[in-house]
């Protein structure tokens, strides 16, 4: 691991986001394994929410798929790794900030990602999202 990856790992341990991710993974009955770059991969998540195919809580990346499919998708892993770094910077308040940004994006764009700065920073396409650049809310109506 690089020094930055070790720092992220330590920050997410100290800010309790990785322990929360491990608790969530355990309660959901996932299988965990050591992943690359200090990440922990949890596979077999079958709860209804969130709907995403993968999501991060601290250094824990939780997938719906099995371990082979999870590790084979390096683009999605990179996207979730960027969320892991966001947790390292913001700690547990990241959860509330993320959901507020997703709600704002849903209101403005009709989806939780296009206007969400956390998803945009992590890479919309890498996370399986498409960009809807035209906000629904605040559009001007042209009179005829």
Label every model-predicted segment.
Residues 2-51, 56, 90, 94-144:
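Metalloprotease/metallohydrolase-associated module, dominated by Zn2+-dependent proteases
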Residues 75-87:
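Active-site recognition of the HExxH zinc-binding catalytic motif
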Residues 66, 86-90:
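Active-site-proximal flexible loops/turns
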Residues 68, 80-81, 119, 125:
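Glutamate identity and glutamate-enriched acidic tracts
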Residues 51-54, 61-77:
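Short pre-active-site segment immediately N-terminal to the catalytic Zn-binding motif
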